UniProtKB/Swiss-Prot annotation:
Pfam family, one: GIDA
InterPro entries in the cross-refs: FAD/NAD-bd_sf, MnmG-rel, MnmG_N, TrmFO
GO (cellular component) term, any one: cytosol
Keywords: Cytoplasm, FAD, Flavoprotein, Methyltransferase, NAD, NADP, Transferase, tRNA processing
Protein name: Methylenetetrahydrofolate--tRNA-(uracil-5-)-methyltransferase TrmFO
The organism's taxonomic lineage, starting at the top: Bacteria, Bacillati, Cyanobacteriota, Cyanophyceae, Synechococcales
Gene encoding the protein: trmFO
CC cofactor: FAD
UniProt entry tagged with the keyword Lipid metabolism: no
Amino acid sequence: MSQSPHVTVLGAGLAGTEAAWQVARAGVAVTLVEMRPIRRSPAHHSSDFAELVCSNSFGALSSDRAAGLLQEELRRLGSLVIGTADTHAVPAGGALAVDRGRYSAALTEALDQHPLVTIERREQQNLPPENAITVLATGPLTSEPLAEDLRQFTGRADCHFFDAASPIVHGDSIDLSVAFRASRYDKGDADYINCPMDKEQYLAFRQALLEAEQAELKDFDKNDATFFEGCLPIEELARRGEDTMRYGPLKPIGLWDPRWGDVNDRDVRRAKRAYAVVQLRQEDKDGRLWNLVGFQTNLKWGEQKRVLQMIPGLGQAEFVRFGVMHRNTFLESPQLLQPTLQFRQRPNLLAAGQITGTEGYAAAVAGGWLAGTNAARLALGLEPIDLPATCMSGALTHFVSEAPTAKFQPMPPNFGLLPDLPERIRDKRARYGAYRDRALQDLEPMRALQPETVTA
């Protein structure tokens, strides 16, 4: 008698959570293996699935932005992880941000209650047997025994970079007589808290960052500290130049406190506008917790408190969580993976998420969707699917499987990954809109493969 179809998913981060759900939705039994809380990672704080360890934001909502287009594609494909993000969204201007505690708890409960999902809390130290259909979604913090087995299997050393998380403060400890609520260019409903700096305050703050003591990074060569450019520590930005932070996370443009006067008065605007602005984004549904946007850091915790309390409005800030830095591991995917996310040398083994070399939450979810869908199809005796390269989700999987291998580095969603449009469109907004329209149209055949959308 033939065995019932079955898939194993290793890792219950964003990619693994999505992959396990897609397998179960296809009617295939799935075992989801997660090492937390048996073994903790350097960056996680809970044992819930799909824990967001860096920001609580999935990026821009608008579908004429790269991150927003990817989110919209995933909604149309029936993504549990993105649908649940919509359910547990918190105000964030034009971005999709979530109450991370409630969000992860809802996803954990959804999988725990699904009759086709078996959850095993243990550390997987080896790749499963070759005949077992498996999704590898252990993420950039894959435990060392499994990482070593993966190196033996691929015959290649893994790649790595260093990532960091931002601090979080209690909202009621922010001084709103100094800080003010607003969204950049008044987009949204004043969803951010903004801490303005004059030039003297900014320069003193930068100097303090440069002089602050950093925490020691363990288990790596200090001469090979590669950072991901999209998530640089704030102290690294400070080192790169006097104005680097002002043109990055501390840019003041588009932010105005009505207490300064009439923004339409040119003289008032010139006299009162901030030299730099630190933004805080709501972290939870109730607005009690706020994270410092773009303030990934590896400073020692005592130094973080000392330096960050120099920010106007944060002089008495109470820190719920300090920033941390950790090593992220990823595969040399162009040498190893097909666009279906199957390993070339073992088609029953698929990879998903940041370990494949994509960057960003939505990109991890997209990889989980495709790997889970294809694992289920393999279990059912069907051919795996390949997403169109004209879609953002497909462009990412084609990139990680087909990119030049020299110095392969993680890639976030961006319109530069998409094939050229048939016609040249000079206006950027119109061009991005055309990319969106083509992507969503080309995605339509994939939607027929999916059952009804469900959210937690």
